[in-house]
Design a protein with these regions (language model features):
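Long, C-terminal-biased catalytic regions of enzyme "large/alpha" subunits
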Residues: 1-190
């Protein structure tokens, strides 16, 4: 039911963009923008207005765009099936991302499978997220989720590379509380 409603709303927006393009002889489009700062601001405002609603305003952030929530455990195939139909409607920009575990640099088939999902589900743009750690003292690298101590030299000077909000970052020190909460809620798509 939520999927049908979401597609109906975004289809209406797409129709209006097409109508305005014809009427004004300018390009109008629908963009599935992340609006990262708003995901936390809107929950705060909505909680003040509507109170705490389980599964909605009780979180510190809203899932942005038309993504499956980051904490929803599902396969990449299921995620693509849900999110793919929106890509044709949001031609101004969109992204499909998949969280994978393990070391993607040594698993090209996992990447190829995700590219096949993109093709099958008419997905225009994708990111594959996975952990990448590097010891800043000896150069050891791996893809463990919570590496704190280098197994080679014992150093705690570990650079943790992650993709957040479209950027590869080694630290989350400057991210707002909503983005940090979202990051901690992320699950691997298996």
């Amino acid at each position: 039911e939520a999927q049908r409603l979401g597609l109906r709303i975004v289809s209406h927006m797409r129709s209006k963009a097409n109508e305005f393009s014809e009427r004004y002889n300018h390009n109008f489009s629908v963009l599935a923008t992340p609006a990262e700062g708003l995901s936390g601001k809107f929950t705060t405002k909505d909680r003040k207005t509507f109170g705490s609603i389980p599964g909605i305003t009780d979180k510190i952030y809203y899932t942005n765009s038309n993504h499956v929530p980051v904490y929803y455990k599902c396969s990449p195939r299921h995620k693509a099936k849900i999110e793919g139909p929106y890509h044709e409607l949001t031609r101004g920009g969109h992204i499909f991302y998949v969280e994978i575990d393990g070391d993607a640099t040594h698993n090209p088939q996992a990447i190829a499978d995700i590219v096949d999902l993109m093709d099958t589900n008419n997905i225009g743009y994708c990111s594959v997220n996975h952990n990448r750690n590097r010891c800043m003292d000896c150069g050891y690298e791996d893809a463990q989720e919570n590496l704190e101590v280098c197994p080679t030299c014992g150093s705690r000077h570990i650079d943790k590379l992650q993709r957040i909000t479209g950027y590869l970052v080694g630290t989350t020190d400057r991210w707002n509380s909503a983005k940090l909460a979202e990051l901690s809620d992320r699950v691997v798509h298996k």
